[in-house]
Amino acid sequence: MESTDQLSKIGKKQLEDGQYENALNSFESAISLNQNDPDLWNLKGIALRSLGRYDEAVECFNKSLEIDPRDKNSS
């Protein structure tokens, strides 16, 4: 089983490569292991935004800010 860090790295690489659906799956897997990491929610939001799923992306960005209101990375 992969760790949240491994899944996050895989997802970031997939984002860079334009594999947005795969990246989304990686970030969702990471979130299932740690639901309180604002960076994971932000990354999931980026993947969703890249897929044109804007409402869901906003929900993820809001969740990231809910966990850490000082998180400047929340898009």
Predicted regions and their residues:
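Conserved structural position within tetratricopeptide repeats
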Residues: S29-S32, K63-E66
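Register position in tetratricopeptide repeats
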Residues: E16-D17, S50
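Helix-start (N-cap) detector for alpha-helical repeat units in TPR-like alpha-solenoids
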Residues: T4-D5, P38-D39, K72-N73
